[in-house]
Amino acid sequence: MNIARHFALAASAALLAFSAVAAENYSGPLKVGTTAAFAPPLETAVAEAKKQGLNVELVEFTDWTAPNVSVENGDIDVNLFQHKPFLENANQQGGFHLVPFAPAIINNIGLYSKKHTAIDQIPDGGTVAIANDPINGARGLLLLQKARLITLKPGAGLKSTVDDIVSNPKHLKIIEVEAVQLSRSLDEVDLAQGYPHYLRLSKTIDPNSALLFDGLEHPEYVIQFVIRDGHQNDPRLAKFVDIYQHSPVVRAKLDDFYGKLYQPGWSQ
């Protein structure tokens, strides 16, 4: 056998082996990780996918760390719970190789209170709860600045911390709480950053009753379907995302679950 033919056969064998592995990787059920805040519409999408011959398994997590670890390790194929700034920070902190695959929705977060009915009623020395992760905590601080309760250093932006506060005229005590627990903090604090979907699940307060909303014109905060880099060609994933984004049944569930406090991210 001449050398050229030997290498040609070797290359063909390698290609066949690679194709077999790729096919195996993209066979079986698509495993989707999420949290309680995004699960109900996904459950509807899973049911619709089954009708179309696509088997999808939904894995629900109770924190915001395990979903990324699970995608990185290959335990699940995709997760849905985070926006791009959170993902970028997670990649930097965890050494992950994760990328956004497609947009899902954006939620209208706000500042909530069970003790006061207007921002100007927040007392001097009052206690305010924001998220304790760097990115969503910054979002909370930006909301407080929008409410004119604090002023941040110019340019602090999406990575603001409490150290960036340059003016706090009401001497507010800002405490940092795990984001999924912010709704429960409302019994103890004067004001809290709130996520409508978690408020709805906890039944702590009407999600529509925020003293101030952030608004939906923030494309950076659109929640993303996130995968490990290199798996962009998974046909199961493309089909499932298409169902999530375009099925009338899923859209009806999104409307029912989030009400008017969300917007499809793929329309931005």
Predicted regions: what they are:
Residues I135-K159, D242-Q268:
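Ligand-binding clefts/hinges and TM-proximal coupling segments of bilobed small-molecule sensing domains
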Residues F101-T151:
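A conserved helix-loop-strand patch within extracytoplasmic ligand-binding domains
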Residues N108-I119, Y221-R236:
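A bilobed periplasmic-binding-protein/Venus flytrap-type ligand-binding module shared by bacterial periplasmic
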Residues E60-W64, N79-L87, I105, E178-A179, ...:
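Beta->alpha turn/N-cap motifs
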Residues T35-E57:
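Short, polar/charged alpha-helical segment
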Residues A20-K31, A49-K51, I119-G125:
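Immediate post-signal peptide segment of exported/extracytoplasmic ligand-binding proteins
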Residues V59-V69, A156-R184:
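Short helix-initiation/N-cap motifs at beta->coil->alpha
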Residues N89-F101, K114-H116, E188, Q193, ...:
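Ligand-binding "clamshell"
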